[in-house]
């Protein structure tokens, strides 16, 4: 499915903003350094200084390209990804859905748009290093702007210690969240919690970086059925894919 239209005043943030800014910084320093070297040596060493400038300009171009792709992934790519992930849940419209690591509400709001009588809960610790402008208030403002504030709520919560009862949700979804936990043990705890609160027969869909193969193993060990891995994608310039499973 193509990316669903969003309200003009909705902002789902830039993922890992310091990293994107760092790549822009590398581009600037590389180009600036090359120009300075060329300017200081252009008369005495015209050929070598020009070659150094060309090499550093190429480095700057690559760094700027990486930064651009990270921004593009955050502004457009993740909207397309959202619809692909939600399609895998095959929502009827009456489900209770949990979004783990909801950020500014991208997946939670997308799921709420597909519901009629169902409800979505998004949880996060809202770390600003993970997403620009990351806060519960920003998520609520986005939900209001998208017209789904009555179908979605946002709670402060730890993915490793979910406060919800067993078999409470019909579907669980998460994107770019679990890799921010400290280590494999912590990620395993979060995966087990996600399955615990999922109803039998419910579906879980997780998108993340290269840890996904391990996620699939943990889900199978916990008894999940129909565990499938998608093809790799390179949004945000890093190999990522989704895992879908049924409890």
State each model region's role.
Residues 187-200:
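A short glycine-rich, Lys/Arg-flanked "PGG" loop and its adjoining helix->strand segment in the class I
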Residues 104-116:
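Conserved SAM-binding loop of SAM-dependent methyltransferases across substrates and taxa
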Residues 148-159:
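Conserved SAM-binding strand-loop segment of SAM-dependent methyltransferases
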Residues 222-223, 227-247:
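Core SAM-dependent methyltransferase catalytic element
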Residues 115, 181-182, 198-200:
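Helix-to-beta-strand junctions that scaffold the AdoMet/dcAdoMet cofactor pocket
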Residues 201-208:
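Conserved beta-strand signature within the Rossmann-like core of class I S-adenosyl-L-methionine
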Residues 92, 160-172:
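A short acidic, Gly/Pro-enriched loop at the edge of an enzyme's catalytic core
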Residues 93-103, 121:
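Conserved class I S-adenosyl-L-methionine
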